[in-house]
Amino acid sequence: MLTPRNLMTFFLMTFGMSIHAELDFQSGCKDLIKSNQCIAAIEGCTVFANQGNPEAQTLLGFLYSGTRYGDFRKNYKQSFNWISMAAEQDYTKAQLAMAEMYKGGEVVPENARKAKVWYEKAAEKGNLDAINGLARLYRYGVGVRKDHEQAFALYQQAALKNHLASQVGMGLSYRDAKGVKKNLVKAYAWLSLVSDNMEDRAFKNIQKRYEQERENQDKTIPQCKFILKYDEFDDLFALGYAKRELLSLKQRMGLKQTKKGKDLAVQLRQEIGQ
């Protein structure tokens, strides 16, 4: 007979097992990647991947295709197989990775239509990177008929939720009159919104640090720790791109237009809650 005490005991045991399993996954997979123990990470992540852990499967896929240097040989087939297993479990990050693989054409042959399918699966669950991916397909007509209005709508959907790359997309759309009437003030505002996330000096310091890390990498051993920083790299790329395009845009605008753009950026920041 189930009593309140029995239920509490069952709950604590189940919760404790869950926490223990998560800690094991952290130390037995993710921490090994973080400390750049690439071969050990593959072995450790494989244990959890074989247990059906979709995050482990995705990380294992990244390890097989993203590890570089040393005597490591990439295995694109294994990478695709593990990531597709996670994607079929409805793991959003894996679905996004499937889209990027089909779009990039390195791990598997390029197939923009399949990329669109996987972007849509992840976008349906609100993944902002996937929404941005769809926007790029429509903007450039990759795998779909070029549709600037649809691209703009998708950029806007993610931009209003503070997705940096989509905010850059908004700025470029207004600048180039793609899917919306040309408006340099609004273009300036959106690009400024992204650029202002980090001061120029701080951004340059981060750039310098990453460049030094890359130059000082020991290429005699496998390198894999950076695969945990993919999202961070994407945001830094968006920041750098926004700063560069904003500087170029300033040269086309007068002082009054620039001031209007700055004021609008403040308004947008308040509306978005940035």
Regions found by a protein language model. Give the residues of each.
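N-terminal leader/linker segments that initiate helical-solenoid repeat arrays
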Residues: 19-51, 55-62
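Terminal, low-structured helical/coil segments at or just beyond the last alpha-helical repeat
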Residues: 209, 213-274
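Hydrophobic face of amphipathic alpha-helices that form TPR/SEL1-like repeat modules
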Residues: 28-31, 59-68, 97-104, 133-140, ...
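Short helix-capping/linker turns of helical repeat alpha-solenoids
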Residues: 50-53, 67-70, 88-91, 104-106, ...
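Hydrophobic h-region of N-terminal signal peptides that target proteins for export
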Residues: 12-20
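TPR/TPR-like alpha-solenoid repeats
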Residues: 63, 86, 101, 122, ...
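Structural signature of tandem alpha-helical TPR/SEL1-like repeats
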Residues: 34-43, 71-82, 109-118, 145-154, ...
